[in-house]
Amino acid sequence: MNVEEYLNQLNESQREAVVYNEGPSLVVAGAGSGKTRVLTYKIAYLLQLGLPPYSILALTFTNKAAREMKERIAAITGDQTARRLWMGTFHSIFSRILRNEAEHIGYPSNFTIYDATDSKSLLKSIIKEMQLDDKVYRLGMVQSRISNAKNSLITYTAYEQNKELVESDMNAKVPLLREIYKRYQSRCLQAGAMDFDDLLLQTNILFRDHPAVLEKYRNFFRYVLVDEYQDTNFAQHLIVQRLCERHGHICVVGDDAQSIYSFRGANIDNILQFKNLYTGCRIFKLERNYRSTQNIVIDKNTRQIPKTVYSEKEAGNKVSVFTSYSDYEEGYTVAARINEMHGILGKFSYADFAILYRTNAQSRILEEALRKRGIPYKIYGGLSFYQRKEIKDVISYFRMIVNPHDEE
């Protein structure tokens, strides 16, 4: 099947978004509207127009999303072409660039990447070395403050010179936070290591301080596409802007009514103000929801780009809201309702139900309620394979072999 045959599978709004390539574009799309399909087919369309695969940069937020998109593109264009695309998460793509340009920022090209656990371990040792009260300088708080600083492009030097931040730390009774940040960065550099936030910070510094390097990648990436743009933070947004502000060959896809990562620094204004940043930006709205019934499609958020979201499915059951007085009552009610719909109504199998909870800590009481009623269930998620103690030990040995200077 060629690209044109794939385009015939799209509705009119989707097709318009895919074939437009005359300037910057914003695809505003709700859940279930086919925005990933649009991004995938747009890449395939650009390849058909003759763009070399290595000149297309596609940024996603998860490895799973990147993998699925690459598989879909491979089905259209062939595996060899799909493999040559620059497609991946912000962190994976920019770590690749930083390894290529490591000499400009004072890091070895084989620098280690610290995950959240490695970062916490190093911060814990620094807090202990400084003989600070860990009930005041709480590990999670310290890590979060440093992460927020980096995502706002505030280096430890800038942090020390920022009167507002220093005063805020004094008022919060954590005046030595800037010293922890300084020691943390010094130890990372000494070990030849970066954490995830450094990958974004250092890429911005690289592009800011080395115009020739920025120019090289501006010319190299002839088209940039970004998924889930509403979840970008300041550092990510600025990198994309630096790469695209001159040629304007950019397409971002996002849902302005769905921003759930503000605690990580995500800024909804990045998508709301996109049209003002790029002259001549075209906005495409994917308003048809293929996933949900009409009663699930909600359009009451006023702070978003105007669009009429609709579903062609039947109305379905109305959404019901239950307020419980305790977590135990919540678990009991959920289990009882599942039992009622499965047993008494007889319309559903247990596999038709899904329970979503905000934190993993909530699962215990829900599991207990399900077990009491003999309802079978399966937990999805849990501890990542790479977070298991024994796996992290093996990875640490590999790190020592690859980078002997990493003593952390």
Describe these PLM feature segments.
Residues V3, N8-V19, G23-V27, V38, ...:
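Conserved helicase NTPase motor core
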Residues G23, L51-S55, T81-R83, R246-H249, ...:
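Short glycine-/polar-rich loops that comprise or flank the Walker A/P-loop
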Residues I93-E101, A257-S262, R291-S292, G381-V402:
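Short alpha-helix plus adjacent loop in nuclease-associated cores
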